[in-house]
Amino acid sequence: MLEDVIKETNDKLRSSYEVFLSDLKGIRSGSLSVSILDGVIVSTHMGKLRLNQVASLSVVNNKMLSVQVWDKSTVGAVKDAILTSNLGMNPIVEGSVLRLPVPDLTEERRKELVKVLKKYGDRAKVAVRNIRRDAISRIKVLEKAKEISENDMHALLKKIDKIISEEDARIDDAVSKKETDILKV
């Protein structure tokens, strides 16, 4: 019973952290990667799809990305999605290929990216607090139903708080590393 609460909490935290890391990949740092396009959603005749579901993405060089659209009828939608993605990219259309010149990161843009990064970090911490709240309420329900003793409840609450503190530290560490990477010229 006690292990179930711990395991469920750890599983939820792991899942939440993976979402947080995927958000971080979408923030551009010093080196260029196609992962900055992960958040681009394209409206197609099949509904809303991620960019990597309608095109092949590649890095041409340090300042250029290439998007090879599979269905020529979606080229316009892909271009619009990139323009409205707030990435600061202006696609050049060459048939079914879009070239994305990636501007150098200005000091101002770096500061904006750090703000976005911190927002993601705060959102991840809110998710962690919600997971903690759920675990605590579940533990208290178990104690009220006399399925666990009061001593077990307190021990479990301490264990949950320790796990949550470690997760907060992991989030802070990831934010700090990414911030250093963004601000590095």
Curated annotation (Swiss-Prot):
**Covalent S-S links between cysteines:** none
- What is the protein's name according to its record? Ribosome-recycling factor
Which UniProt keywords are listed?
Cytoplasm, Protein biosynthesis
Say which family it is in: Belongs to the RRF family.
HAMAP family listed in its UniProt record: RRF
Which GO molecular function annotation, any one, does this entry have? ribosomal large subunit binding
Record-linked Pfam families? RRF
Which species does this protein come from?
Neorickettsia sennetsu (strain ATCC VR-367 / Miyayama)
> Gene3D superfamilies under this entry?
3.30.1360.40, Ribosome-recycling factor
Protein localization? Cytoplasm
What is one Gene Ontology biological process annotated in the Swiss-Prot or TrEMBL record? translational termination
The function of this protein is: Responsible for the release of ribosomes from messenger RNA at the termination of protein biosynthesis. May increase the efficiency of translation by recycling ribosomes from one round of translation to another.
Can you quote a single GO CC term? cytoplasm
